[in-house]
């Protein structure tokens, strides 16, 4: 790749406006997703009746039906190639993503999942942004990404011999898929609502396979547990959370993925309070590194090469 690179301060990026609103949307998504790790870990770790397959069915069975009228109304106005890009969105934030992440949460704590999926997603988004959009992080963002990488590496290495390796691998696969989906959404110019509707509606394809598998525990679940999971999975985590994050991407561009690294902080606190998953010294240091990294990543600039 040839050309010159000029660093643009984050507050003056010329390709996006509405920074304050973008931060608000990003923080809304962060709050919802932090709780999702705790709520989902509670279910799939044996504390509840529902399993990973049930949670994914609730998540997209409900949100897909809610957003189906939206997609039908907006379909004629979608940009060319939107349906092709939608496949990337489904893989990176739809039913396959949610199923792999939920299965990983059976094997590793909520704090690990939150650190290794939304925590490392900015690293993958930065890499794919460089390849597909010609973006390069400035010095401050680069330092932030380095701190995120260091925190994640410390967490993985410290628990490599404790049976959590498969869970960690699942979390990192999800982070990579999410990162490329984010970049491709930006490149395609999809509006936040369109991207969310495409992801949730196309993920409805999971439901028939779920029903035919005979793996459902919905009828056996207590009404209270079913109601909590239906609202959190089907409305908050999918429709509201995805819409908020996609809106943040539209307003903040390359800086939006950085805010997701705040999720480990809130998820770790929530898991300690509600699930008795008290972090050890390594987890605390890793989360601190990730939190510092996201702050630098959000404040730093982006270089456009070309």
Annotate each predicted stretch with a short phrase.
Residues 58, 94, 98, 112-120, ...:
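Helix-helix packing/entry segments at the starts of transmembrane helices
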Residues 35, 39-42, 46, 62-81, ...:
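Membrane-interface helix-cap regions at the ends of transmembrane helices
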């Amino acid at each position: 790749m040839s050309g010159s690179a000029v660093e643009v301060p984050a507050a003056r990026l010329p390709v996006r406006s509405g920074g304050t609103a973008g931060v608000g949307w990003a923080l809304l998504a962060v709050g919802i997703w932090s709780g999702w790790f705790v709520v989902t870990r509670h279910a799939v770790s044996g504390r509840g009746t529902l399993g990973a397959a049930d949670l994914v069915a609730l998540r997209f069975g409900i949100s897909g039906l809610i957003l189906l009228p939206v997609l039908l109304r907006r379909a004629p106005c979608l940009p060319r190639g939107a349906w092709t890009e939608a496949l990337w969105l489904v893989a990176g934030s739809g039913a396959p993503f949610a199923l792999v992440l939920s299965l990983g949460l059976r094997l590793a704590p909520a704090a690990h999942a939150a650190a290794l999926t939304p925590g490392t997603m900015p690293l993958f988004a930065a890499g794919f942004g460089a390849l597909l959009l010609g973006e390069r992080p400035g010095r401050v963002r680069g330092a932030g990404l380095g701190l995120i990488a260091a925190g994640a590496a410390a967490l993985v290495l410290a628990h490599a011999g404790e049976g959590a390796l498969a869970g960690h691998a699942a979390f990192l696969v999800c982070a990579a898929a999410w990162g490329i989906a984010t970049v491709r959404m930006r490149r395609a110019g999809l509006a936040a609502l369109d991207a969310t509707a495409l992801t949730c509606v196309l993920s409805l394809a999971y439901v028939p396979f779920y029903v035919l598998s005979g793996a459902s525990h919905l009828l056996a679940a207590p009404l209270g547990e079913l109601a909590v999971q239906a609202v959190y999975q089907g409305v908050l985590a999918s429709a509201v959370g995805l819409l908020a994050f996609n809106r943040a991407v539209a307003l903040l561009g390359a800086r939006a993925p950085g805010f997701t690294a705040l999720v480990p902080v809130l998820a770790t606190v929530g898991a300690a309070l509600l699930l008795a998953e008290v972090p050890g010294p390594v987890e605390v240091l890793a989360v601190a590194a990730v939190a510092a990294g996201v702050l630098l990543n959000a404040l730093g600039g982006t270089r456009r090469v070309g």
